[in-house]
Amino acid sequence: IAFYDLDWAFQTRSNCFFNLIGSEQTAQIAPTIRWLFGIDDFKERLLTRYAELTETTLSDEHVTEKIDGFRALLAPEIARERAHWGGSEEGWNEQVDALRANIADDYAAHTVRNLCDALGVGEEERMEYFGF
């Protein structure tokens, strides 16, 4: 399944959803997702790959490191950016802090549970793929 609008998806837990199969609001995505689930081993491959990603690229630790790195990279430019577009450096820092806190609070496990719920994966099968 494709990532989209990652700043929105990572910002709050309520934005972490997988309702792409039947929602009429996502009609451009739903046919593709339905087609993929028609492939015999797609669900297994999806769960296996997501398990790998939540241990590496999408792990809470890795994502918070990326947030910290981008914060350090962008911090010198924020005063100029806010002067042009409005807002304050303090407001920017508050948003970055909120994003970081959301990820640091076991976000990967939250996404795993949402994904498993959406796919009808029970606790035993979730344990096999994700270890919890």
Task: Pin down the residues of each PLM region.
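Middle-to-C-terminal accessory/interaction subdomains
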Residues: I1-F132
